[in-house]
């Protein structure tokens, strides 16, 4: 309860600090100190001072909300409510609901029952699946609505105050609804399948669950550029023939095959700049923000793309997918051990009781927090590899330096952070380190 109140009130607290309200008066220009050290812009520092506590709060409060929901008995109450709903029993305060529930939920149970192979129907029923699905959807909707004020403040109001958002409030809300819908479908499939496996294979479920985890993550990587991204952006093939020729020449020097190049209309949402490689196999493609094409020189764009090609060359996406899959698979065995020893204390009917989902999500969140230093260290290593590849292939250290100076201004990025913050939170090396790498590369080339 306390954690939920913190989530609801924290946007007001951040607003009362006045940081966002004064952002328009701050300069976004970086400067150099007398000793030659690059200094972050006042606006970037203000944004960082706002985002850091918000990020820490989001990390820590979310699992506490879930634990509170579990230990208070509310999770058990929600499961009982969902069971009554699935059985078409009367719900308090809902007039005329039983007949409607029997008709519509009866159809749902029938459809879900037909999804179960006959050999499995003695261990898992259509009602089991329906209860799990309804519980998951309601929990996801409840937590999303709880975080809606926080999300709206952080990703819309703050973005407008600091001048990098180009969205209207209705457009932001529509994106939020689409994102929630995708999450409901994905979580519904994943967690309903998870609880079905717990019923079918009480002892061996981590083995098929791990395989499914790796397979589903591969499917997500494959379909995201084709099905998900177009829901949020207008996408069109790169039309600039001269830039296409430069990209193809760059890829040829890097020993890579590139055929699909696309541009997304990031300018419809923000002024932020980026480019990335995505997908596997035939879905693999280069994606450029239109903000990159309109505000940067061809040499700077080439440096960005060379960096992204470095990720491709070193197979960072593939290695990340395999590493995350292996870690997740091992984690499933740890989760089995934990569930077998804690379900009775939580008042659950067994490990396969969907009422234990908040507990599972909280455990996953805490483990993810503990893993941040290792995960982000590997990410920074990969980014340094890609930076070095970019310099080695493009041979444009001056453009590299100019690029990151512009990034610091346009993306309102601080150029350096305390070491503890870099270790725990940063997925990329500080901008000063990346510029220093380019300066060292230029000095070595001039020798």
Please place each PLM-identified region on the residue numbering:
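N-terminal signal-anchor/signal peptide hydrophobic helix marking the start
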Residues: 352-360
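Polar-ligand-bearing catalytic/cofactor-coordination segments
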Residues: 2-4, 11-93, 100, 104-352, ...
